[in-house]
Amino acid sequence: MKDWNECFACLNAGLPDDVRRLKEAGYYQLAIARVDALLAEDWAAAQNQPAGAAALPVNPTPQGPDALRAALTAEREILRRLPQVYTLSASQLLAQMQQLVRGFTAEEFAALDAAGAMDWRFVEGEKRYICHAADTLLATHADLAARQLDPPLPLPSWERYEAQHEQMVRTGSASAEITLQAGIGMSDEAFAAALAAARAQGRDAVHVRVWLPLPAACPAQSGIELLSFTEPPAFVAPEDAAQRTAYWEADLTENRRFGAVYRYRSTAHYADPLHTAPDPVQPAFDTEEQLPHLEFTPYLRALAAQLTAGLTDPVQKAKRIYDYVTLNVHYHFQPPYFVQENISDACARSRRGDCGVMAATFIVLCRIAGIPAQWQSGLVARPELAGCHDWAMFYIAPMGWMYADCSAGASMARAGNETMRLHYFGNLDTDRMVANRALCAPFDPPMCAFRADPCDNQVGEVEADGVGLYGEQVVTEQKILEHRYL
């Protein structure tokens, strides 16, 4: 069975001009219709050959170039999902902000809009803002956050990580033992719709496949224990899987969730790259392109050349790239990676992104500069909460693999904490759960339907009767049961 997620590697093939113009103008239904026509086209029947002429050689691309067909296939699903991401009219978003922020005015809204503070697209001729635009404004504008009518609980203080940094400098490492409960399943509404569709086809159950992230073996994680499952999984991927999961497959007549409880030890080992001499010869692994999001575009090549001009020390090159990302890229909630064609190139142009976008930008710039770099992701696992997070790794001999958490570094830059900004160049903290060590890696067993996130896997994936679910169709849980600093 074909893995449709592999089509994303061909996104840089681009779109035919008419489809591109329709997409940019937000006429998604017309664009989908045009894509369908292109995918159905018989090139052999349309080739340059007058009626009644002698037979020509067999057309070498009877259905068009494979790369273009793959790009069109991925873009069709992107076009279908985009209107579900950009849902708010200006009046709806203004009303949301006025309900959240004391004294928020239409003039403030217009000024923020003119400054590009809110992500938007045209959708079928109307300007529509991303569904979580209000959350982004509150997260990125301190003046608005200070005027919230119902402010959230304060975030945990960074002081614990300053103390952890001091411990790591003093003793070489810090550790925590973490027990976490995670789960995933269909929303009741999605299950009811799927069951109705199944019954209309003469079936009495929904065939469900589920992948739930699990902690993977890596230098930062040890003592991994899978304590319990809601029901025995059909398969548990090995600890060294690129994106490790537990996998279930079931025919459901009633909706239910799938979950696990696991425990592991997280250890943050201290590295001091700025005060260690690199070897004169460095390795070349993990320095290649990885499409679509780690593409060596002309713009990224030019940026990497500017950042590393005059430098020969790989540590200084990596540090210059880290400085660029953490000092210039503003944290900004993102549309799903599914609907983005190249997150790193877009970040370098817009200077905004979330943790994964910042990590990808660091990785691709390092690779262009000849510095091995990898993706790593999973969860933030603090005593108070668990949540999604991504970061990067880079390799410099003789030190080996080190970390770069650019979004944490950017937070420290905003707070004026240079000590901790530098900490996240080379180091992490203990409050992590690592499930993924590669971007856009397949599962074991593979998911062939379009994933909710073809790049990463932080909360899991669900497939119902061969269709990948996403957004409000899926319900997930990540809960800290026990957290002990050791």
Set out the residue ranges of the language-model regions.
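Acidic low-complexity segments
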Residues: 15-16, 23-30, 238-349
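Low-complexity, Gly/Ser/Thr/Pro-rich intrinsically disordered linker/tail segments
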Residues: 428-486
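Intrinsically disordered, low-complexity N-terminal segments that are enriched in acidic
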Residues: 50-52, 63-270
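Inward-facing hydrophobic residues that define packing positions of alpha-helical scaffold repeats
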Residues: 34-35
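Hydrophobic/aromatic-rich core segments of domains that either
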Residues: 13, 17, 21-25, 357-447
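Active-site nucleophilic cysteine motif
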Residues: 314-321, 351-366
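TPR-adjacent "capping" and linker segments in tetratricopeptide-repeat scaffold/adaptor proteins
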Residues: 2-14
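Alpha-helical solenoid scaffolds that mediate protein-protein interactions
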Residues: 38-39, 45
